[in-house]
Amino acid sequence: MQGYNKVYLIMPNLEFVNHSCLILSNNNVSLAMDPWIEGSVFNNSWDLLSKTNQKSIENLKKSNFVWFSHEHPDHFNPSNLKIFSDKNNFLFQKTIDRRVVNFLKKISPNVNEIKFKNKFRLGKDFTIQVVPFQYLDSMSIIKINNLTILNLNDCDIKNDFQLKFIKKLTGPIDILLVQFSYAIGKSNKDNKDERKKWSIEILKKLSSNIKFLNPKTVIPFASFCYFSKKDNFYMNDSSNKIDKTIEYLSKENPNIKFLCLYPGDMWDLHSNLSNIDSFNKYNEDYKKINVIPYYEKTIDFNNLKASSDEFIATTKKKNNLFYFYNFFNKNKYKIFFKLTDLNKNYFFDFNKGLVLSGDINSNKPWCSLTSQSLNNLFTSGYGYDALIIGGRFESNILGLNSLNKIFKFQAKNYQNIYYNIDTILSNFLKKIFKTTKIFHNR
């Protein structure tokens, strides 16, 4: 086996590193997952709630295998991967574009693309199966010493079909890893009731999913971060806190054990641990969150115009049915942008591109954001995701609808889905010959 042969533990062990990152080890073989250990993500929108333990970072470096669930930066963070070397083995789902795989090969030649249903052997009594989910995400089923661990990370289970599909793959589940708070920022500052509703709905759905999957132990994770900039900090006002989350889930599922782990904590996969110490540490961290100062370069109109023109050209080039969609959606393919740092207003559509505008009627579709956020929206492959998830913007309902329509091309193209005749035909055939999968080809 390539990689570090001398790892720190022989008996089965779980070390919680931070957010969605943990290290599983067994018989001197270790598997790390989704390392985000420092820095801001989603165009400088989120930061970690708690500091990563330095010893955990050292253990990450020594991991034999590192699995990434998907390409979002709180799971696959290029700037954090500098801690790894050619001695590490990387694991990722099989994809068409191979973006992640090609990036990882610059660090190590030991990159394994895991196809659906293939069980990858990590070591003795230690395997991982990667299950793609919807368009971009994936979950993992880990077998370790006759225990089954299901890591759902960000997979948003929406219906019974998906639950049944997953349960058929896993069989009885010993340990379930799940996200527990909202990870989206499309809510204006004065819409606190909306955010409260999100939080309640997340807990109710999570509880329902737990009842169906019926694991012995649940570890809520992948939500230990916060909205950290001045233009999205208000988004923290209704997020689910770990102590209240476990309190609610425990009442709804009294026969299931719920475990809270703090960065650096270790667990032998069997022992009963008290959550009190971890709760106290997280509550102290919640109290300390604050806006992180960040110098952001302003982008002048000429550069924004060039970025918008390139965005239009790329959209039309990659989607040969663009003009068909544009004909039927002209009124939704336009939006006004209020640039908060430049104190200027602009109008955008696919015909004129970006042009200077006067005052904006509140009944028109609008979105307020910084010039840098707008530039990132036009230029980044997942600029739309970064904006919607990061929450560094506000808009009216019409504006949000326009954002969804205008940038759906970009978002889907990043997932290798294109609006062209081949795609329409493929989707038509899929409806005729229904497949029983929970993911789209990627």
Regions found by a protein language model. Give the residues of each.
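Cap/insert and terminal regions of metallo-dependent hydrolase folds
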Residues: D160-E252
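Feature captures hydrophobic
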Residues: W267-R442
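Active-site environment of divalent metal-dependent phosphoester hydrolases
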Residues: G39-S40, E71-F76, R98-V100, N118-R121, ...
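Mobile, glycine- and charge-enriched loop segments
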Residues: L136-S138, K143-I200, D285-F311
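Pre-active-site segment of Zn-dependent metallo-hydrolases
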Residues: V29-E71, P78-I83, I157-G171
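Metallo-beta-lactamase
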Residues: F90-L147, E247
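Conserved beta-strand hairpin/beta-sheet module of binuclear metal-dependent hydrolase folds
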Residues: I10-S56, D137-N153
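Active-site neighborhood of phospho(di)ester-bond hydrolases with catalytic His/Asp-centered motifs
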Residues: A32-D34, S63-F76, L91-K94, L150-C155, ...
